[in-house]
């Protein structure tokens, strides 16, 4: 507990309301951050690559490792939502990306990050190839914004996956749905989801996501309380 507190204070600052947040300025991103090889396993009979679609993307979405032993990089929401990415990869399977596109995405993808923001909405999604079109095991899409009053067009999509939810008994349906309006601190894996360019400017501001989410903490009286267990 003491070590966690030291990391928290070192990477964060306090605003006028007494709420803690990361100190990274917009445009800044940690240098030399690790890109660990994803830990991937089958879940309820579904392999890491799912049952169709973009196998490489699905494998990243289905990773289950916990941020290289908890070493998450504190990055501000503004920095994350403004990260660059190639403009010509929308709905293009990763096997068909150019080398320059791969290099541009690899610069940030697969880094364990931690950021703060406000939950603008939560939705239990339908069936997807990532989860082998299971009706029982589906993602929760969460829209994260810099301010509680922001529209989803300014949000970053972050996702709860069935594989991670299976390891987090506190992530009940009611707990996840009740996050709307709360200030949260999210830890998870940075991922570029190229499959939804039509949502830009409508229900998201970027194709970058935190996917999967590994830890969720809620601000309660100026301190972060985990809802993982």
Name what the model sees in each region.
Residues 9-11:
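C-terminal motif of bacterial Sec signal peptides marking the signal peptidase cleavage site
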Residues 1-7:
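Sec-dependent N-terminal signal peptides
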Residues 18-229:
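OB-fold and OB-like single-stranded nucleic-acid-recognition modules
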Residues 13-15:
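Bacterial signal peptide processing site
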